[in-house]
Curated annotation (Swiss-Prot):
Pathway: Protein modification; protein lipoylation via endogenous pathway; protein N(6)-(lipoyl)lysine from octanoyl-[acyl-carrier-protein]: step 1/2. CDD domains: LipB. Belongs to the LipB family. This is Octanoyl-[acyl-carrier-protein]:protein N-octanoyltransferase LIPT2, mitochondrial. InterPro entries: aa-tRNA-synth_II/BPL/LPL, BPL_LPL_catalytic, Octanoyltransferase, Octanoyltransferase_CS. The lineage of its organism: Eukaryota, Metazoa, Chordata, Craniata, Vertebrata. It is found in: Mitochondrion.
Length: 224
């Protein structure tokens, strides 16, 4: 007997503010929680204006440090995702899966591992050998290429992953990314020694997601 695959819809939001993306996520989450709604599982794809965000594990961030980061021209936002401080900005492909894990597997640990495997598989499609480490995320050697921080309530996921494509990496010089001392950051462009914009990464990411999560996927943009 064949098993029906979960259906996922990918939506490209373009470049939007972090706060706008949070509102869109909350709308999708609420629709999932509304028993009368039949909203599909969704991947929200976007880039952000420069913003530093901190997660639930972050100790109270010193006001002086917050002001220092804002003075650089970035926004600053506290979130309910897992993890510590990171940066989002132009040239970084951000993917927010709003999924009902009941359609997949009701395990947050499984879900995070599948996100990591998705990005590793996507990197492989570019010819980049990536891996996991004891620290959440995806790495190329000792350099993080993709940060992962999620939230899950009543098995509905939000937040997600941030893949460095052709990001201005100097933004990371102002923080200790994800609170991990002694490690660096990298991007698809750095690893391939050519410009790789987010739009080039989207088809490979969606292909890898479809394979890893064993789902059907529709996309409102061109995959060519």
């Amino acid at each position: 007997m064949s098993v029906t695959k979960a259906a996922v819809k990918a939506v490209h939001l373009g470049r939007i503010s972090y706060h706008s993306a949070l509102k869109i996520q909350q709308q999708h989450i609420q629709q999932h929680l509304d028993s009368s709604s039949n909203i599909p599982n969704t991947l929200l794809l976007c880039e952000h204006e420069p913003v530093y965000t901190i997660g639930l594990r972050q100790a109270p961030y010193p006001p002086a440090e917050e002001q220092r980061l804002k003075a650089l021209g970035a926004d600053f936002c506290r979130t309910n995702r897992g993890g510590l401080i990171t940066f989002h900005g132009p040239g970084q492909l951000v993917c927010y899966p709003i999924l009902n894990l009941g359609c997949f597997k009701k395990s947050v640990r499984w879900y995070v591992c599948e996100l990591e495997r998705t990005v590793i598989k996507m990197c492989g499609k570019f010819g980049i050998k990536a891996s996991t480490s004891p620290d959440t995320g995806v790495w190329v050697g000792d350099n993080k290429i993709c940060a992962i921080g999620i939230h899950c309530g009543r098995y509905i996921t939000s937040h997600g992953l941030a893949l460095n494509c052709n990001t201005d990496m100097s933004w990371f010089d102002n923080i200790v990314p994800c609170g991990i001392v002694g490690k660096g950051v990298t991007s698809l462009s750095q690893e391939l020694e050519r410009d790789v914009p987010p739009d080039e990464a989207i088809p490979k990411l969606l292909e890898a997601f479809t394979e890893q999560f064993n789902c059907t996927l529709t996309y409102n943009g061109s995959l060519s």
